[in-house]
Amino acid sequence: MKNWKKIMAGLCAAAMVSSMVPVWAAEETTEEAADDGDVADVSEAMLGLWKDSAGDIYGFYKDNSFFGQWKDEEQDVLGVYALSSDGEYTALVMQFANDDGTYDDENMVTYLVQANEEENLLELYDPDSLDLTATLEPYEADGDESDYNQTYQDMGDILTECYSGETEAGETFIYAANDDGTFCSVLVIDQDDNYVSFVGEGTFDEENGTVTITDEVSEMALTFGVTLNDDDTLTLDMGDLGSATVQEATLAVAVQGLKYAVENGTEMN
């Protein structure tokens, strides 16, 4: 569980994105360049799951969060990314979370990125030499039941919000949902990597102010009330099951959380 805690670094990471614009872009971007469609075009093209020649997997999500699965290092990383343009080049800045969940400039990398629409590739170039550094192609599931990457990616495409925190008992609690709350995901994982998950349809009871999530596999349901606190955190009251206090996190946290639990934990429901 300690390793999981280290990489639970998506909390409020979206606030970092605005400060990640490269210096050269911040200084040289003109009003015309700011209106250029390159950034928007690249941003839309790169959403999804990609794989490079080394087998590393890159997941880019709509809230500017990032989830990397490094094959050689046998580890997963969370981070945030930002795109900017000087009118000629589009820069991709990727900032990875440190082991303690913090962010700093030392754990950051910048590429020039180009979407090769004809071949459906993402090309990453060195910003100084302009040499091609990596070519990313869309990830394709291999059909193996143990390959959950496409399932996680599909979930990431649906979700639009994520909240993460802890229960009263100190368990990690992750709640995510789509725009209208009709698809939700809840993951609760304890210090021994035992976990309970609910992934499926969500319904909101306006009269009682409760959310009910019915797992599409087990058909078990979880109901909790939602209270907004003064510090912008949420308290989720599950009745006899206790409560959890959560705050806004990135979509990558929801995706990685479920992946971690399935691959490393023991399912309890």
Question: Residue locations for each model-derived region?
Answer:
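N-terminal secretory signal peptides that target proteins for export/translocation
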Residues: 1-3
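Sec-dependent N-terminal signal peptides
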Residues: 5-15
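Sec-dependent signal peptide cleavage junction
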Residues: 18-37
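Tryptophan-anchored aromatic micro-motifs
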Residues: 32-56, 147-173, 258-269
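N-terminal glycine/threonine-rich, aromatic-flanked beta-hairpin/loop signature
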Residues: 52-101, 168-210
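An anionic, turn-rich surface loop/hairpin at beta-sheet edges
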Residues: 90-113, 209-228
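Short, exposed beta-strand-loop hairpins at the edges of beta-sheets
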Residues: 121-132, 234-242
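C-terminal partner/receptor-binding element of secreted or periplasmic proteins
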Residues: 132-149, 243-268
